[in-house]
Amino acid sequence: MVDKTHFDVVICGGGLAGLTLARHLRLELPELSIAVIDRLKRPLPEAAFKVGESSIELGTYYLGQVLQLDPYFRKYHLPKLGLRFFMGKSQGPIEERPETGQSIFPLVPSYQIDRGRLENDLRDVVQKMDVELFEGTVVESITLAQADENHTIGCLQKDEQRNFTLTARWVVDALGRRRFLQSQLGLKRDSGHYASSAWWRYKGKVNVNDVAAPESHAWRNSSIEDRYYSTNHLMDTGYWVWLIPLGSGATSVGIVTDETIHPQNTYGQSFSQAMGWLQQHEPALWNFLKDKEPMDFLSFKNYSYASAQVFSHRRWSCVGESGFFLDPLYSTGSDFIATTNTVTVEMIRRDRAGQLTEADVQTFNKLVIDIIFQTCRGFYRNAYRSFGHAQIFTPKLSWDTAIHWAYTYQVYVQGFLTHPTEEMLALGERYRDLNESVQQLFIDWAEKAPPRDIYVRGDMTRMRFLQLLHLELAVRRDSQQVLDVARKNLDHFDALAQVLFWQAVEECYPENEMLKKRPWINTWRMVLDPEKWAESGMFDAETTPRPLDEMRDNFTGIFAPQNLRDRLVYNLSFNIMHWQKGFVHYNVVPALHHKLIFRKPAMWVRNLFITDHQPQ
């Protein structure tokens, strides 16, 4: 018997997106009546449950700060030592592969998450907050209301095979890949990114360090913190393999491929087939795993998809994977949960105040789908072909991270997601379009140039522009300051793209005469093929030329061996931060950061890392 059948908000789906939305609503709008419906009953299995086990900075900010769960994550889940990549040379020892990854835990935290543990705990949390949970219940229908009437949700309680109906002013689709409303309303779209995956879990610790030869002591000791705590990626042309530690003590392993290069039917039909694929493509990892028994095995073909609309002024929304999904690379899934949940809360807030307009919702859809989603889509579409090129993927990783921190993260934490302005939207379109141009450059570069090693172990803490953007994750500025910095950073991304373009030309067309001049170009129109330069309009620059030394220095040891100056200037600060197992980083920097930067405008900090020019 269902005691209560009408709610202010009914959330269809009790996974990570639905449960976090329920908590978010209860914290922000405590007067609401909220129900969550999910087909699964507790207890949910730990470890062998769902993927999406790794977070990055924006998702962590949402989970830890907005939802006030930071103490919980610190206690029950694992700290994340950033993203680590072993690129190319997949037939050899892992310790001899080009590597990019951090040696010390970053100042702004992120976590390795056991999804079963988290979702069990979140159900307990929201239930204690007086959220009504309908567990073991299937959503069979959603009838959207006309005008100001209530929505109707048809449900089936599985154990009793009993049908019942709920009504709500707001209905939220958090049913994940079932994409109930997207299917019903004809809103599904192709993402243009065709990739597939298979994954499984092992009991116990699978440490990437142990994949190396036993005598590789110097390589093991080259990272202050244990590589085990990173999201480890073993990559080559068309694929990557993940190793993720879980707080329950298990380890998640997955294969992810470009479907056009490594079809899912070559590895995704069974665990034994997946291991055979690893034996062929990642023999060192296969040799380490070959005698271990998996806890589970799952596979998904063409997992990526897009949407025409996820928010409606008619009082519905699609959050998390019920709207769109791009790729597990970079762990952006929780970022999109954060953005779609936060917009949903804002729409409900405005609706209760009688202030929600159709124009508001159109703007939210534009920001989330046309700008943030499409910018992130550029990171992945056709990009897997560069994964065996260490000299290309390392700057790509830096670029992708910088774009995400400089625009998407700042839009969220500085309040522009819920209160977007025309100027911030216009800047977002410029960031998106420049990103598309640079991503195409990476693709064309990888098709033309052979893979080669980088000259140092890549570590983004060596790159001053990324150091600055990482510090600025913690600042809080007024609207005008945020816009000013976004314009200045776009100026730097333009300069960074100039450096990347001429490096690509140097590697792909070393005899080209323009290398002697290296003129300033329009990076929004650049094309790598010299035969297309004249028609592209890329020599009609829209921005003012300026020195490129600062941007070029971000790639010291990547494009060419380090010279004496590089070793003195850039390695010195790196070595100071890593002295005595990171003593300065862990003890001195956090105190200064909290006193001088945390939740402050800290405009002065930019002068320590970069020279800002007047944006065009």
Regions found by a protein language model. Name each.
Residues 44, 125-284, 341:
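Predominantly flavin-linked oxidoreductase catalytic cores and closely associated redox partners
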Residues 26-51:
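Glycine-rich FAD pyrophosphate-binding loop
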Residues 3-17, 35:
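Beta1/beta-strand and adjacent pyrophosphate-binding region of the FAD-binding site
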Residues 104-124, 263-269:
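Short beta-strand to alpha-helix junction loop
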Residues 17, 21, 42:
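Conserved Rossmann-like nucleotide-cofactor binding loop
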Residues 237-239, 245-247, 259-383:
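FAD/FMN-dependent oxidoreductases across multiple families
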Residues 45-92:
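N-terminal FAD cofactor-binding segment of flavoenzymes
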Residues 347-615:
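C-terminal helical "tail/cap" subdomain of flavin- and related membrane-associated enzymes
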